[in-house]
Amino acid sequence: MKNYINNYDRATAHIACVGMGWFPKTPGGLDRYVYELTHSLAASGDRLSLYGLDLPEAEPNPGVELINLATADSPLWQRLWLTQRNFLNKQPVKVDAINLNFALYSLPLLPVLPNKVPITFTFHGPWALESEKEGESKLGVFLKQSLVEKSVYRRCDRFIVLSQAFANILHLEYQVPSSKIHIIPGGVDLKRFQPNLSRQQARLQLNWPQDRFIIFTPRRLVKRMGLDKLLQAIAEIKSRIPDIWLAIAGKGPLQLALEQQANELGLNDRVKFLGFLPDCQLPIAYQAADLSIMPSQSLEGFGLTLVESLACGTPALCTPVGGMPEILTGFSPDLITSSCEATAIAQRLEELIMGQIPLPSRAACQDYAATNFDWHKIAFQVRQVLLT
């Protein structure tokens, strides 16, 4: 296997990357992606200028320069004005490529982006459509899509998406030509996410029960994540699988409603709401579980949780939504439920737990993740698109 860690067999490039927040302070999928990409490229010899909000003053990696654009809690107009001003004032004299990652903070940069530098937008999701799913007004959705997203996308030379599902959305909803779209999956840091603990050791560290079948899901507690469906599914099978135990990590506006639902379903001794789980404990939680799950109901562009879980040696179950099936189809199609409904989730959980469908081994999970989603390999593919 080719070693991508030390060098990509090419001249060093200077790449400017405009993100959003700072991982792990804001542990969302976009921020994690930008962090891992920039640090993987820097580890291979490139020079990275990373722009974002609330970035720290110091970065131990000498190949990554951090440029703070604004503070996230400032008024929107001020954030956008400062984003443009600070990007313009601290723009490198010479840069080989620019990678944008979030439309809102890319919008004020449009007048000041250099003309002869390739601009690539990494499409992490349809911001307007996600807002609509969370109850945004029709006017708000229209403004986000027409005045922000489409304006930014018209300026970009090419696009990276993490799945065919999001390539379709980018083409159909935003009229981006298919010829400009490159599909490159997300990656996982195999040094952090690896099976280095026994299940018993991991459970002991987290103070989780040793004698239960544990399902783990790290999710934002919002509607489209499908946690209400998952709770219904657990309630359906609890009488037949009394030792089932669900651990939910994450925060969000639905926390009280979900806790109330769990109580009404009689799941207090079978569901644990962990709240915010520090990033350092995430690999431990995956290893402590018998199974991870993503019960998403809509707009799941990739499914990083699935890959992280597999890298830790733990099988992962998903609903047939967005890009998630693209991860698991080539590995174990039985880890995809037949629908998003609670009954389908319950049926597949019961089949897996009762052994009617065998769960992949720890070694098979880790090997599949390492072969297909190693960040160093993914970063190499991204770099090729950025510099084309």
Which residues does each predicted region cover?
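Conserved donor-binding/catalytic core segment of Leloir-type glycosyltransferases
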Residues: 16, 209-225, 231-234
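Conserved acidic donor-binding segment of nucleotide-sugar-dependent glycosyltransferases
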Residues: 330-342, 351-357
